[in-house]
Amino acid sequence: MTMMTATQALSVNPATGQTLAAMPWANAQEIEHALSLAASGFKKWKLTSVAQRAQTLRDIGQALRAHAEEMAQCITREMGKPIKQARAEVTKSAALCDWYAEHGPAMLNPEPTLVENQQAVIEYRPLGVILAIMPWNFPLWQVLRGAVPILLAGNSYLLKHAPNVTGCAQMIARILTEAGTPAGVYGWVNANNEGVSQMINDPRIAAVTVTGSVRAGAAIGAQAGAALKKCVLELGGSDPFIVLNDADLELAVKAAVAGRYQNTGQVCAAAKRFIVEEGIAQAFTDRFVAAAAALKMGDPLVEENDLGPMARFDLRDELHQQVQASVAEGARLLLGGEKIAGEGNYYAATVLADVTPDMTAFRQELFGPVAAITVAKYAEHALALANDSEFGLSATIFTADDTLAAEMAARLECGGVFINGYSASDARVAFGGVKKSGFGRELSHFGLHEFCNVQTVWKNRV
């Protein structure tokens, strides 16, 4: 089942297969209206004080809390996220608004330089209308983690959301309007690929931010580059989760299961390749399989369920093909490996063992509830295996040796390293990757400055 046709985007409940809504693609005139509104909104918004913008963020956070259950239910219905996790996404998004409202203004203060007598400073100015192309897996968080700092910097934000979460896109826009966000400062348009190209090439778009697949990011990045538009790309990941012999086994297994199966495995920065030192490999594998088997799968609106359906039917088919290919290549299937028969787009929690670097499960991103376990001979071997990937988003190390962990972190080719804990995005730290995981950073002051005109102001230079 596709989530789009030539004429419209389809919102389909993956737990039932029921079509929730069909929304026509925006035509050229509607896209022109969205661009015009965003451009006029920017002209006014950039003149507001940072304090005013920060208050708007606080108001957005409050509005999100007021509509928390409604928003969570929409997320769960449209993309299948277990309801407890959907509620947590709303809570995290509201907290993001508060964090930037409190800490962001200071990050926009003029920055001193080493020029004598403070004659030169760096100013962070608004850039313009930012086009955001966002995915379905965190339909609220992914939008706001870019939009909140973009708005605080004085830019306007124009969203093109994933076609299977148009209900979430509409609700986000409604909540921000209710919070008092001025017209044109935040907008969204249901654009298809041609519409996206129209917007990227329009001179009113100053920059583009994309979270999505490598293929989509490369295509959009190429268009943005041809138009000389700045672009931030947050793309795929096949993150290594290293477990060394001296690791706290119970803690490592708990983090591994949470890190792999949250959001039914549909997380770009999730642990996907479990690289375990051979002295602890069997014990880790046994406990991991038992813990994964104990996860409850079913209706994502039922509180007790840990795993819901995969969001898209085509991606379940692709994942199953990757699992089958890996088994044919020699991987050992320890758990799952099958589509769940009946209503809904469910895929069993799956564990593959004896995975080697030449196999599909090691080389490709597995975007679903599938874990691949690879045995490393020693720590240096584990490090080499971790870096043997075209991706470089995040990595995890479990060890009792803090010195070794720090040394390994310095040599891991990725944007984030988590020691004795699984990866996550957090407003307080930068998020992003290297290699084919993309470039640029979101969150913290890095995400705030990404879409600023970093302007040098130098007085009395002779």
Ranges and model annotations:
Residues 1-118:
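N-terminal Rossmann-like NAD(P)+-binding subdomain of aldehyde/semialdehyde dehydrogenases
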Residues 6-9, 271, 393:
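Short loop/turn microsegments at loop-to-beta-strand junctions
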Residues 13-22, 205, 242, 296-297, ...:
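Conserved C-terminal structural/oligomerization subdomain of aldehyde/semialdehyde dehydrogenase
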Residues 215-356, 419:
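ALDH superfamily catalytic-core signature
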